[in-house]
């Protein structure tokens, strides 16, 4: 096994990545948007984080004779293109004593090896994100329970994926004992750990769950790495009410942990269901072959599934000509231009990704959130530049400058704006890249980027000018002394004559 990870696996991954290059690559803007969404949710419990996903069975070549390397490369490409949840259908081959992905010749452990390679390659502050693997067993496997009880399922998981990356039931219990778990109302002994702690403190990446068949396994297998079916709220599109039309409906849904919605969706409806608080599991196959007609379709599906805040072409610190002209027509107290600030663009007639780039010096109202209540909003009566958002008087008493951090919060904001009879409005939200270009962060206009050290140009000039002046003076002094010589050499012969004359007058011997 060690030899596989040290030699065979890296070579396979390299060949797989070469083959994966036929997939359409993400733009820089798409990468910034995905990272921005992750960072917005750092203090959200992991059970409330939207996890774009699909049924793996529907996305792989549907033949038992399909090329294994090609299928594993497809899985790796899906991971690299932002898929965070997989419904994995498993079947147990009694004669081989092995678990396989249903309908394929791919061993489950090989699929886990692929996930492990991806996790190792992306285990950085910039790229790390949570993954969920939801396991479902076919009917033949469920009927063959006696043979399965002899198999050590936990050993299969540990063979395929490093246990250090897996968030276990014991990890959850420990975090609850340490008061490190959250609900929508703050710390809770029945909640889940926040995304930031999950990724960067306890350094986990993967959550396993059973969708059925947990009773097939021994107690050791049940109580170790895989959470039981009752942990997850897994439903189909026919069993929900959407859209949510009141804050009460939103609060009711938010009490449900790990919400997954399985269905055959069109990309135009992804945001509609995301704002109902569900992680989507697509059952309709996404054609991953990148011929001239499929590449654009795949990109459209992925961007619509992954993004609920920014458009796929934002953020990029630039605006197109139409947006630029819109800003020039708006009122502004300054001639300066800085497209580094986030605004929410609300239109009652379109449920589009609402975040956009705005000129920080433009005058707009501010979005205000009530204390620590996730779903209560207000729009300030006063307008101002983004840099004035630090003014405590901008928001009503009890409110502070805010931003929607989940699709559910975004839906609650739309409900508030609709109740206020607002048809069309742009307003500032608490997200910007002022400190470092394309590092989109919250915390007001003076927040610093966690990924890059920053010093303002003004402060840099203030620090370097005195040093430069002193260095210049010292340089001039050096040049002066090199140019104007002190006449020590010229007087040496004269001194020698004086000393010789004095020596002649001296009396040799001891004076009497």
From Swiss-Prot:
Places the protein is found: Membrane
Gene Ontology cellular-component terms listed: membrane
Residues with glycosylation annotation: 43, 67, 93, 139, 152, 179, 239, 264, 290, 311, 378
Cytoplasmic side: 482-512
Membrane topology designation: Single-pass type I membrane protein
Main location: membrane
Ranges in a coiled coil: none
Pfam families with a match to the protein in the record: TIM-barrel_MTC6 (PF25506)
All ranges on the Extracellular side of the membrane: 21-460
Transmembrane segments: 461-481
Signal sequence bounds: 1-20
PANTHER family xrefs: MAINTENANCE OF TELOMERE CAPPING PROTEIN 6, MAINTENANCE OF TELOMOERE CAPPING
Function of the molecule: May be involved in telomere capping.
Official protein name in the record: Maintenance of telomere capping protein 6
Organism: Kluyveromyces lactis (strain ATCC 8585 / CBS 2359 / DSM 70799 / NBRC 1267 / NRRL Y-1140 / WM37)
Gene: MTC6
């Amino acid at each position: 096994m060690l030899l596989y990870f040290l030699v065979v696996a890296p070579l396979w991954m390299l060949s797989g990545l070469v083959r994966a290059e036929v997939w359409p690559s993400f733009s820089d803007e798409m990468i910034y948007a995905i990272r921005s969404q992750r960072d917005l949710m750092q203090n959200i419990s992991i059970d409330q984080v939207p996890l774009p996903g699909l049924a793996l069975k529907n996305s792989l070549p549907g033949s038992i004779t399909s090329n294994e390397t090609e299928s594993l490369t497809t899985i790796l490409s899906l991971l690299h293109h932002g898929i965070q949840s997989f419904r994995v259908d498993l079947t147990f081959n009694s004669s081989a004593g092995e678990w396989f992905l249903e309908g394929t010749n791919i061993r489950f452990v090989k699929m886990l090896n692929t996930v492990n390679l991806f996790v190792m390659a992306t285990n950085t502050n910039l790229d790390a994100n949570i993954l969920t693997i939801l396991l479902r067993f076919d009917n033949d496997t469920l009927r063959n329970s006696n043979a399965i009880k002899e198999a050590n399922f936990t050993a299969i998981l540990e063979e395929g994926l490093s246990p250090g990356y897996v968030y276990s039931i014991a990890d959850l219990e420990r975090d609850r004992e340490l008061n490190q778990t959250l609900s929508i109302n703050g710390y809770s002994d029945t909640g889940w750990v926040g995304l930031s702690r999950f990724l960067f403190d306890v350094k986990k990446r993967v959550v396993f769950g059973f969708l059925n068949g947990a009773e097939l396994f021994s107690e050791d297998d049940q109580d170790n790495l895989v959470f039981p079916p009752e942990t997850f709220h897994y439903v189909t599109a026919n069993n929900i009410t959407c859209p949510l039309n009141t804050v009460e409906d939103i609060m009711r849904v938010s009490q449900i942990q790990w919400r997954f919605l399985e269905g055959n969706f069109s990309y135009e409806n992804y945001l509609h269901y995301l704002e109902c608080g569900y992680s989507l599991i697509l059952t309709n196959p996404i054609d991953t072959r990148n011929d001239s007609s499929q590449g654009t379709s795949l990109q459209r599906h992925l961007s619509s599934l992954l993004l609920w805040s920014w458009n796929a072409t934002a953020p990029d610190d630039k605006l197109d000509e139409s947006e630029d002209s819109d800003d020039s027509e708006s009122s502004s107290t300054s001639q300066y231009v800085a497209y580094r600030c986030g605004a929410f663009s609300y239109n009652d007639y379109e449920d589009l990704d609402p975040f956009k780039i705005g000129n920080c010096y433009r005058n707009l109202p501010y979005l205000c959130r009530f204390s620590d209540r996730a779903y209560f909003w207000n729009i300030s009566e006063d307008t101002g530049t983004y840099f004035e958002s630090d003014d405590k008087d901008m928001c009503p008493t009890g409110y502070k400058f805010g931003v929607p951090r989940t699709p559910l919060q975004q839906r609650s904001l739309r409900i508030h704006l609709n109740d206020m009879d607002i048809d069309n409005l742009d307003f500032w939200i608490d997200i910007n890249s002022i400190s470092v270009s394309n590092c989109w962060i919250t915390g007001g206009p003076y927040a610093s980027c966690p990924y890059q050290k920053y010093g303002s140009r003004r402060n840099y000039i203030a620090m370097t000018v005195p040093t430069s002046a002193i260095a210049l003076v010292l340089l001039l002094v050096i040049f002066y002394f090199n140019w104007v010589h002190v006449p020590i050499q010229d007087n040496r012969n004269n001194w020698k004559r004086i000393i010789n004359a004095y020596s002649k007058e001296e009396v040799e011997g001891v004076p009497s």
